[in-house]
């Protein structure tokens, strides 16, 4: 069989398969390549390695309490809406607040919010939204709050082991099938628990069993590292984000992001951090210089100066992105 005959035989086989199972059976491998939703943090986009959260994939953001997981997810919501995307929020915890959304720069009227009564209903809603092909991003808050219907309807004495994990496994299989044909990104917010009886090594485990680990293209481990203060007032937290699983770029990269209360990320500050790291802005003593020009004395004054001088800031920003692109090639 020569190469032309083999190619023709393959084309005929593909036509037969598409005739039997539908035109969407096959797609080009490049169909979702380089399509991302920005995280809102240049540092995090750089750690992920492709410039943001990949479209058409499942993402897990997990960590301990008060580490910034929800705000990190909401920053992605903000970026998606800013680019004209459609976003749904599955509020299983019933904790979303319109005032907080407004503080983060998110218009609450542009966010579709669902509050499912039980876990299976949440998965049905997510699957239906994916199949519309009209929703770009779905955030699920949180895995621990996706309680199986059987657990809700049963008495405390009748609770059985493993129902949550089984529900997650079944639901994720359904979502994965739908996502293979659509562009929606689904972010699951998850918590960590301590394993009982573990004396040595890592005693932490995420809720919901192993299925989410398996189906996730990207897993982000979020840990609060320190408080950000202005004088004696706590104005935010610094969190370490580690990419523990990455199927679109090399894994295990990490970054430290500053999350300010009622604001979220500060992109301007991150640009300045990168500019100093790449020596686009140079430091001598307490003074900062750009192209031999003295900008400001002290980091706070530098931040204020660049926020007030847009032309110089935009010039530095372009150089930073050029450097990031060069390093990611």
From Swiss-Prot:
Primary role: Can catalyze the hydrolysis of ATP in the presence of single-stranded DNA, the ATP-dependent uptake of single-stranded DNA by duplex DNA, and the ATP-dependent hybridization of homologous single-stranded DNAs. It interacts with LexA causing its activation and leading to its autocatalytic cleavage.
Q: Where is the signal peptide?
A: none
Superkingdom of origin organism? Bacteria
* Record keywords: ATP-binding, Cytoplasm, DNA damage, DNA recombination, DNA repair, DNA-binding, Nucleotide-binding, SOS response
Q: Which Pfam families match?
A: RecA, RecA_C
The UniProt similarity line reads: Belongs to the RecA family.
Q: Which GO terms describe its cellular component?
A: cytosol
Q: Which InterPro entries does UniProt cross-reference here? A: AAA+_ATPase (IPR003593), DNA_recomb/repair_RecA (IPR013765), DNA_recomb/repair_RecA_CS (IPR020584), P-loop_NTPase (IPR027417), RecA-like_C (IPR049261), RecA-like_N (IPR049428), RecA_ATP-bd (IPR020588), RecA_C_sf (IPR023400)
UniProt-annotated location(s): Cytoplasm
How is this protein named in the record? Answer: Protein RecA
């Amino acid at each position: 069989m020569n190469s032309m005959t083999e190619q023709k035989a393959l084309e005929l086989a593909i036509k037969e398969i598409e005739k039997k199972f539908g035109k969407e059976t096959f797609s080009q491998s490049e169909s979702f390549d380089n399509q991302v939703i920005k995280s809102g943090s240049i540092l995090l986009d750089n750690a992920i390695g492709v410039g943001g959260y990949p479209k058409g994939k499942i993402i897990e953001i997990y960590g301990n309490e008060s580490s910034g997981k929800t705000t990190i997810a909401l920053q992605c919501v903000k970026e998606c809406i800013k680019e004209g995307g459609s976003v749904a929020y599955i509020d299983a915890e019933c904790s979303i607040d319109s005032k907080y959304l407004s503080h983060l720069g998110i218009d609450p009227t542009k966010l579709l919010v669902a509050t499912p009564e039980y876990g299976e209903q949440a998965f049905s809603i997510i699957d239906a939204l994916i199949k519309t092909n009209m929703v770009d991003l779905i955030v699920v808050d949180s895995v621990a709050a996706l309680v199986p219907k059987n657990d809700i309807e049963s008495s405390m004495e009748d609770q059985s082991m493993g129902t949550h994990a089984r529900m997650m496994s079944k639901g994720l299989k359904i979502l994965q099938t739908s996502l293979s044909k659509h562009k929606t990104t689904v972010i699951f917010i998850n918590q960590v628990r301590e394993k009982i009886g573990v004396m040595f090594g890592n005693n932490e485990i995420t809720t919901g069993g192993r299925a989410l680990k398996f189906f996730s293209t990207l897993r982000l481990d979020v840990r609060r590292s320190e408080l950000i203060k202005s004088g004696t007032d706590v104005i935010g937290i610094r969190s370490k984000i580690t990419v523990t699983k990455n199927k679109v770029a090399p894994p295990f990269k990490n970054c430290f992001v500053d999350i300010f209360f009622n604001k979220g990320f500060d992109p301007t500050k991150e640009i300045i951090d990168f500019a100093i790291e790449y020596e686009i802005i140079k430091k001598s003593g307490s003074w900062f210089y750009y192209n031999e020009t003295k900008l400001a004395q002290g980091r706070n004054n530098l931040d204020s100066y660049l926020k007030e001088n847009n032309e110089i800031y935009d010039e530095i920003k372009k150089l930073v992105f050029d450097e990031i692109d060069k390093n990611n090639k």
